[in-house]
């Protein structure tokens, strides 16, 4: 068959299997270079060098067969990446090298030795882990991934990057970076203003290491950073201030004694006065212990000018702390303390974040996929959740950025610029003000719901909540990985953990009560036995509550999906409650709603398809013909662990928790858990599904009344009388697949628009993916939805005779917000014994190999029928009838109408909303001349230039004084006008593209030729 160019993106080439190999002689040369670098350049001891050489040798064969799968694809760069990854793994997992004194090596040393930056390192490291996972497990044990702490360190880097920018912005607003008026008649050398900046960052880093856990949450770290700002305000010379303490709106909290500094900072940075006061106290203690400074008995008497018009209550002044003659010494002492305290076992030197020019930082973002940071720009397909997105503004939604007349971006203390840090602080304020004051026990109304069940379930529910939350919020989750310190870090972690546990418990009871109230209105009765006695439902609710608390504080050591493992549920289980949880908590901040929407996308795109997902336990009932493949791949979920097993595993004390009256009933909600496709049940249609938003992709006529919530979690194996006798599993799987189809539609539209494909091609791609969902569901098993979409686009391009290569598709995909390189670099396959390549068992291949060896053999009949323009043949209809829950495959619908991104309020003072234009609309509305006045994300007005630089160019053009020819037209163009324009364009291009397609259109394989 004819071939086409292999995909590539951003300069990297993705080739088929067997490409990019080098000979054995090249491998030997690599070993020599690696050994020489370990000994001469890095000076590693014999133990570390021996371990590194062992890992390098055992993974060398994988490296030689994957020479184009990392970085730009050049052998030299791939060798540098691979060597760096090997050394990092040895430094984290090896038996020695826990510190510099043991001959260890830090991540910074590794990066500098191989001329890499931190952004590229973390982007490429997951690919290394996928390929070398079996080798690492053999050398270091099955828990190597947990001990490597790669995700935690990456999230920590993201936090530090955000905090450093937050600190720089705050410092520049409060102080001068350059001393324009140095003091006269000073015998000592003038202290540079930048030295004060460095002092603040170093003091913060020492505070994090000595007082907080090594991987502390973002909110606690921000409190510590604000406490450092308070110390700087009190001690930095007045001449370096950028504000007038009496007149600045940033210090609005005043009393007869002057400005209340702590209260003013709390208002400005959305911190808690109690937490900030504690952080300031810890900072002062460090100054006494490390810098050996003594606090003045009366702060106001020690320094009149710096504390003038400031209420000294709660503040401490240290004489000579930041005086010019002692600043240099203070910096040296902090540097020494930091170097002595930092754990060098693969760690970063966090001082580099104060230097924007540091080559190790690199450029780009690490937040996508690794850690969800609210407040960042959201692209269309992230905003348009496959579930019914509920993103209405809430009272706690943060204010928007406002351009200040002074040019510093601050309208007032209440109009700080929106950043991920400020958004996290605002969301934490919601927890503090709305959830924390609630009682930690069920309310009277909720207790009445519990007692109205066939058996009072109060003790069961409170016991379960105590055990599950105890498993999530344990010291082992947050406090065990800390730096050696003489201070009481464990005690601080225990207090913090208990506070977060209480917040999750209160949120759980609050939302549960709201759900029960809504259910009684639907059922016209108070008996909610089926819902309130369901074990899986409660665990999902507790997990959702805990996840929101963890997401609010931006914890590093308990990032999603950690809550799933702790609670014993799967991603498919959690997906059932997300929409309902959001609907029943009216005060939930917008950013937390977005967080849940993004989680649902992750669940649908890949996590629900992973091995061990409970989705397969329902699918094996709904589609009996898939049972052989599900069992062959071993995809079924294990039984949900009992509460007693969870308590024993996490050493949770049951003292104070009510006993479980009937131990056998603990498993009753899951007693019909699917292990065989021949059982039966009485579940009604899923209440979490809005009938207007989700319909089964294979039965669009289901329009039943919204059923009660308690029907969502019953066993999937009995007939459902509300749906014409179909099994509950069939209804549930239909709902799930409809969400998959909607998510696919969103992703397909975004990528097809970027590739500038016609509407007809877009609809063909969507129709093909729909057919795969219905008839070839097994293609999704253990894979990512984007892998199927990428292959579908290329397949449709081939039958449509478009000059579109896989290389161009991947290049466009890499610009999408949801892109992860692993999607096209590593696709799961399970070779059957009859495979033509002779391989057997599990493997991960590039997307071209998957397309040629798996996708095309499976989907070729569908592609041929799609190219011929005919409906599925009789054989396929009969196959769908056997596989699916419905008697026949319906006619595929046209591409669904999808909403644009929700409009956002951009002004705190005026009701001004902005709804971003999609690429297709923007290209239609803007002429070539007018496009130069707009800066678009992902597209520059000039080659090789970022949108941020575009803004400067645009401002310069607008302020140049040149007359604009013609009159500006500010008329609002409706979506209808745009749609008509696009429809005309698409119709014309589609007609031209598909005019010559016949039933004999060949389905071509993709070959790795350039």
Curated annotation (Swiss-Prot):
**Which Pfam families has this protein been placed in?**
DUF3452, RB_A, RB_B
Keyword Transcription in annotation? yes
SUPFAM superfamilies according to UniProt: Cyclin-like
Region of interest: Pocket = 419-861
User: Which biological process annotations from GO are given for this protein?
Assistant: cell differentiation; negative regulation of G1/S transition of mitotic cell cycle; regulation of transcription by RNA polymerase II
Q: Where is the composition biased (Basic and acidic residues)?
A: 664-679
Keyword list (alphabetical) reads:
Cell cycle, Nucleus, Repressor, Transcription, Transcription regulation
Predominant localisation class: nucleus
Entry GO CC: chromatin; nucleus; transcription regulator complex
The record describes the protein's role as:
Regulator of biological processes that recruits a histone deacetylase to control gene transcription. May play a role in the entry into mitosis, negatively regulating the cell proliferation. Formation of stable complexes with geminiviridae replication-associated proteins may create a cellular environment which favors viral DNA replication.
Family membership noted in the UniProt record: Belongs to the retinoblastoma protein (RB) family.
In Swiss-Prot or TrEMBL terms, this protein is called Retinoblastoma-related protein 1
Organismal lineage: Eukaryota, Viridiplantae, Streptophyta, Embryophyta, Tracheophyta
Gene name, per UniProt, is RBR1
């Amino acid at each position: 068959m004819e071939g086409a160019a292999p995909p590539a993106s951003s300069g990297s080439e993705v080739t088929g299997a067997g490409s990019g190999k080098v000979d054995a002689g090249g491998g030997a040369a690599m070993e020599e270079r690696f050994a020489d670098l370990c000994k001469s350049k890095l000076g590693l001891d014999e133990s570390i060098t021996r371990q590194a050489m062992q890992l390098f040798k055992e993974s060398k064969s994988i490296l030689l067969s994957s020479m184009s799968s990392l970085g730009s694809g050049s052998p030299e760069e791939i060798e540098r990446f691979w060597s760096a990854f090997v050394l990092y793994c040895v430094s984290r997992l090896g038996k020695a090298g826990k510190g510099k004194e043991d001959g260890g090596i830090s991540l910074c040393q590794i990066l500098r030795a191989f001329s890499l930056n931190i952004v590229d390192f973390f982007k490429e490291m997951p690919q290394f882990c996928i390929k070398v996972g079996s080798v690492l497990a053999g050398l270091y044990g099955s828990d190597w991934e947990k001990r490597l702490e790669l995700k935690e360190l990456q999230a920590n880097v993201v936090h530090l990057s955000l905090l450093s920018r937050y600190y720089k912005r705050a410092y520049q607003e409060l102080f001068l970076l350059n001393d324009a008026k140095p003091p006269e008649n000073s015998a000592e050398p003038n202290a540079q203003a930048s030295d004060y900046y460095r002092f603040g960052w170093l003091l913060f880093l020492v505070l994090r290491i000595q007082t907080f856990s090594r991987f502390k949450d973002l909110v606690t770290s921000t409190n510590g950073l604000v406490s450092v700002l308070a110390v700087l305000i009190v001690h930095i010379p007045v001449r370096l201030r950028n504000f007038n303490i009496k007149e600045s709106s940033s210090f609005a909290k005043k009393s007869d004694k002057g400005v209340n500094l702590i209260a003013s900072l709390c208002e400005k940075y959305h911190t808690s006065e109690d937490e900030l006061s504690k952080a300031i106290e810890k900072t002062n203690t460090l100054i006494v212990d490390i810098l050996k400074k003594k606090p003045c008995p009366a702060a106001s008497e020690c320094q009149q000018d710096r504390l003038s018009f400031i209420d000294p209550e709660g503040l401490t002044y240290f004489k000579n702390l930041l005086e010019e003659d002692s600043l240099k010494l203070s910096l040296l002492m902090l540097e020494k303390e930091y170097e002595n305290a930092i754990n060098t076992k693969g760690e970063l030197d966090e001082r580099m974040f104060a230097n924007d020019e540091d080559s190790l930082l690199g450029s780009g973002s690490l937040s996508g996929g690794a850690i969800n940071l609210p407040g960042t720009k959201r692209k269309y397909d992230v905003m348009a959740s496959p579930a019914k997105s509920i993103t209405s503004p809430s009272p706690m939604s943060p204010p928007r950025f406002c351009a200040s007349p002074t040019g510093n971006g601050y309208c007032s203390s209440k109009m700080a610029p929106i950043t991920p840090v400020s958004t996290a602080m605002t969301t934490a304020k919601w927890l503090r003000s709305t959830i924390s004051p609630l009682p930690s026990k069920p309310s009277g109304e909720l207790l009445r719901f519990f007692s109205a069940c066939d058996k009072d379930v109060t003790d069961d529910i409170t016991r379960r909540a105590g055990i599950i939350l105890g498993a999530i919020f344990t010291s082992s989750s947050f406090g065990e990985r800390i730096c050696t310190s003489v201070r009481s870090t464990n005690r601080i972690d225990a207090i913090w953990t208990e506070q977060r546990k209480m917040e999750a418990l209160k949120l759980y009871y609050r939302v549960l009560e709201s759900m029960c109230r809504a259910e009684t209105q639907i059922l016209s009765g108070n008996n909610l036995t089926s819902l309130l006695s369901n074990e899986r439902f409660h665990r999902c609710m507790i997990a959702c509550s805990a996840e929101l608390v963890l997401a609010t504080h931006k914890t590093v050591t308990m990032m999603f999906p950690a809550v799933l493992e702790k609670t014993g549920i799967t991603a498919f289980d959690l997906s059932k409650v997300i929409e309902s949880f959001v609907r029943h908590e009216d005060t939930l901040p917008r950013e937390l709603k977005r967080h849940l929407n993004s989680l649902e996308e992750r669940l649908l795109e890949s996590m629900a398809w992973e091995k061990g997902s409970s989705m397969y336990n329902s699918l094996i009932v709904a589609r009996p013909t898939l049972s052989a493949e599900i069992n062959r791949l071993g995809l079924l979920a294990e039984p949900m662990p009992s509460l007693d097993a969870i308590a024993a595993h996490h050493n949770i004390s049951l003292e104070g928790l009510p006993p479980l009256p009937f131990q056998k009933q603990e498993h009753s909600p899951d007693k019909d858990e699917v292990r065989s496709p021949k059982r039966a049940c009485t579940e009604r249609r899923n209440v979490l599904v809005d009938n207007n938003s989700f319909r089964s992709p294979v039965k669009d006529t289901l329009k039943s009344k919204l059923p009660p919530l308690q029907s969502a979690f019953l066993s999937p194996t009995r007939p459902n009388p509300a749906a014409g006798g179909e099994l509950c599993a069939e209804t549930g799987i239909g709902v799930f697949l409809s969400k998959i189809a909607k998510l696919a539609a969103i992703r397909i539209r975004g990528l097809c628009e970027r590739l500038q494909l016609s509407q007809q091609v877009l609809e063909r791609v969507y129709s093909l993916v729909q057919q795969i969902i219905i008839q070839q569901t097994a293609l999704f098993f253990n894979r990512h939805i984007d892998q199927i979409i990428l292959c579908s686009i290329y397949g449709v391009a081939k039958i449509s005779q478009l000059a579109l290569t896989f290389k161009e598709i991947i290049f466009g995909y890499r610009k999408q917000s949801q892109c992860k390189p692993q999607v096209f670099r590593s696709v799961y396959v399970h070779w059957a014994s009859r495979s033509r390549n002779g391989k057997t068992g599990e493997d991960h291949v590039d997307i071209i190999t998957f397309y040629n060896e798996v996708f095309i053999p499976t989907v070729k009949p569908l592609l041929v029928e799609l190219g011929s323009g005919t409906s599925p043949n009789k054989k396929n209809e009969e196959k769908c009838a056997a596989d699916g829950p419905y008697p026949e495959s319906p006619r595929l619908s046209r591409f669904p109408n999808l909403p644009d991104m929700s409009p956002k309020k951009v002004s705190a003072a005026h009701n001004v909303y902005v709804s971003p234009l999609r690429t297709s609309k923007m290209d239609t509305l803007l002429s070539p001349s007018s496009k130069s006045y707009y800066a678009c994300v992902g597209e520059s007005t000039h080659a090789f230039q970022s949108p941020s630089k575009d803004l400067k160019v645009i401002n310069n053009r607008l302020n140049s004084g040149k007359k604009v020819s013609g009159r500006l037209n500010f008329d609002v163009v409706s979506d209808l006008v745009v749609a008509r324009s696009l429809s005309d364009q698409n119709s014309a291009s589609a007609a031209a593209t598909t005019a010559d397609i016949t039933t004999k259109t060949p389905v071509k394989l993709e070959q790795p030729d350039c």
